[in-house]
Protein backbone atom coordinates (compact mmCIF):
# COMPACT_ATOMS: atom_id res chain seq x y z
CA UNK A 1 0.00 0.00 0.00
CA UNK A 2 1.24 3.44 -0.82
CA UNK A 3 1.78 6.20 1.64
CA UNK A 4 2.18 9.83 0.87
CA UNK A 5 5.58 9.87 2.59
CA UNK A 6 6.52 7.39 5.25
CA UNK A 7 9.20 6.82 7.80
CA UNK A 8 9.98 4.47 10.62
CA UNK A 9 9.16 5.99 13.97
CA UNK A 10 9.09 5.09 17.60
CA UNK A 11 5.56 6.30 18.20
CA UNK A 12 2.56 5.43 20.29
CA UNK A 13 0.44 2.49 19.24
CA UNK A 14 -2.22 4.74 17.63
CA UNK A 15 -2.41 8.21 16.14
CA UNK A 16 -3.14 11.01 18.61
CA UNK A 17 -6.61 12.54 18.28
CA UNK A 18 -6.63 14.05 21.78
CA UNK A 19 -9.01 16.92 22.21
CA UNK A 20 -11.23 15.68 19.40
CA UNK A 21 -14.27 13.48 18.96
CA UNK A 22 -12.77 10.71 16.82
CA UNK A 23 -13.73 7.05 17.18
CA UNK A 24 -10.74 4.75 16.77
CA UNK A 25 -11.75 1.44 15.19
CA UNK A 26 -9.44 -1.40 16.19
CA UNK A 27 -11.53 -4.53 15.64
CA UNK A 28 -14.59 -5.84 13.80
CA UNK A 29 -16.91 -5.56 16.82
CA UNK A 30 -15.96 -1.91 17.32
CA UNK A 31 -16.52 -1.28 13.60
CA UNK A 32 -19.94 -2.98 13.63
CA UNK A 33 -21.07 -1.02 16.71
CA UNK A 34 -19.90 2.29 15.26
CA UNK A 35 -21.58 1.73 11.89
CA UNK A 36 -24.82 0.55 13.54
CA UNK A 37 -24.96 3.76 15.54
CA UNK A 38 -24.29 5.83 12.42
CA UNK A 39 -27.05 4.01 10.50
CA UNK A 40 -29.57 4.42 13.34
CA UNK A 41 -29.11 8.18 13.42
CA UNK A 42 -28.64 8.73 9.67
CA UNK A 43 -25.45 10.66 10.22
CA UNK A 44 -22.72 11.48 7.77
CA UNK A 45 -19.49 9.64 8.57
CA UNK A 46 -15.91 10.33 7.57
CA UNK A 47 -13.58 7.34 7.57
CA UNK A 48 -9.88 8.12 7.82
CA UNK A 49 -7.71 5.20 6.76
CA UNK A 50 -4.23 5.71 8.16
CA UNK A 51 -1.21 4.07 9.74
CA UNK A 52 1.06 5.02 12.61
CA UNK A 53 4.13 4.74 10.36
CA UNK A 54 2.71 7.20 7.80
CA UNK A 55 4.03 10.74 8.33
CA UNK A 56 1.15 12.52 6.50
CA UNK A 57 -1.30 10.46 8.58
CA UNK A 58 0.32 11.66 11.79
CA UNK A 59 0.42 15.23 10.49
CA UNK A 60 -3.30 15.13 9.58
CA UNK A 61 -4.42 13.72 12.96
CA UNK A 62 -4.62 17.08 14.82
CA UNK A 63 -6.64 18.63 11.97
CA UNK A 64 -8.98 15.62 11.88
CA UNK A 65 -9.53 16.02 15.64
CA UNK A 66 -10.13 19.76 15.22
CA UNK A 67 -12.65 19.17 12.42
CA UNK A 68 -14.47 16.65 14.62
CA UNK A 69 -15.19 19.48 17.06
CA UNK A 70 -16.07 21.98 14.33
CA UNK A 71 -18.58 19.58 12.73
CA UNK A 72 -20.29 17.77 15.64
CA UNK A 73 -23.08 16.36 13.44
CA UNK A 74 -20.55 14.30 11.48
CA UNK A 75 -19.15 11.05 12.88
CA UNK A 76 -15.35 10.86 12.62
CA UNK A 77 -13.81 7.39 12.46
CA UNK A 78 -10.14 6.47 12.24
CA UNK A 79 -9.24 3.05 10.83
CA UNK A 80 -5.68 1.72 11.14
CA UNK A 81 -4.90 -0.06 7.86
CA UNK A 82 -2.61 -2.53 9.61
CA UNK A 83 -5.28 -3.55 12.15
CA UNK A 84 -8.27 -3.69 9.78
CA UNK A 85 -7.04 -5.00 6.40
CA UNK A 86 -10.50 -6.29 5.49
CA UNK A 87 -11.84 -2.70 5.52
CA UNK A 88 -8.90 -1.59 3.38
CA UNK A 89 -10.00 -4.12 0.77
CA UNK A 90 -13.71 -3.37 1.17
CA UNK A 91 -13.19 0.37 0.61
CA UNK A 92 -10.45 -0.05 -2.02
CA UNK A 93 -7.90 1.98 -0.06
CA UNK A 94 -4.63 2.12 -1.97
CA UNK A 95 -2.71 4.83 -0.10
CA UNK A 96 -2.66 6.50 3.29
CA UNK A 97 -4.18 8.70 4.41
CA UNK A 98 -7.47 8.16 2.58
CA UNK A 99 -10.63 9.94 3.71
CA UNK A 100 -13.97 8.45 2.68
CA UNK A 101 -17.13 10.50 3.17
CA UNK A 102 -20.33 8.47 3.56
CA UNK A 103 -24.04 9.17 3.95
CA UNK A 104 -26.70 6.45 4.30
CA UNK A 105 -23.98 3.81 4.01
CA UNK A 106 -23.02 5.12 0.55
CA UNK A 107 -19.70 6.67 -0.39
CA UNK A 108 -20.33 10.28 -1.45
CA UNK A 109 -16.75 11.51 -1.74
CA UNK A 110 -13.14 10.45 -1.31
CA UNK A 111 -9.86 12.26 -0.71
CA UNK A 112 -6.45 10.63 -0.92
CA UNK A 113 -3.53 12.39 0.73
CA UNK A 114 -2.93 14.56 3.75
CA UNK A 115 -3.22 18.06 2.26
CA UNK A 116 -4.84 20.18 4.97
CA UNK A 117 -6.40 22.70 2.59
CA UNK A 118 -7.97 19.95 0.47
CA UNK A 119 -9.39 18.26 3.55
CA UNK A 120 -10.86 21.49 4.91
CA UNK A 121 -12.39 22.24 1.49
CA UNK A 122 -14.07 18.80 1.41
CA UNK A 123 -15.73 19.56 4.74
CA UNK A 124 -16.85 22.98 3.55
CA UNK A 125 -18.34 21.40 0.41
CA UNK A 126 -20.06 18.74 2.48
CA UNK A 127 -21.67 21.35 4.72
CA UNK A 128 -22.71 23.91 2.10
CA UNK A 129 -26.46 24.27 1.95
CA UNK A 130 -27.93 23.05 -1.33
CA UNK A 131 -30.13 25.59 -3.04
CA UNK A 132 -31.96 23.01 -5.12
CA UNK A 133 -32.70 19.36 -4.50
CA UNK A 134 -31.59 18.35 -7.98
CA UNK A 135 -28.22 20.12 -7.93
From Swiss-Prot:
Record PANTHER family: THIOREDOXIN-LIKE PROTEIN 1 (PTHR46115)
PROSITE patterns reported for this sequence: THIOREDOXIN_2
Residues of the Thioredoxin domain: 13-128
Pfam families, per the entry: Thioredoxin
Annotated function: Probable thiol-disulfide oxidoreductase that may be involved in the redox regulation of a number of cytosolic enzymes.
This protein's record includes keyword Transport: yes
UniProt entry tagged with the keyword Ribosomal protein: no
The protein's name in its UniProt record: Thioredoxin H5
Cell compartments where the protein resides: Cytoplasm
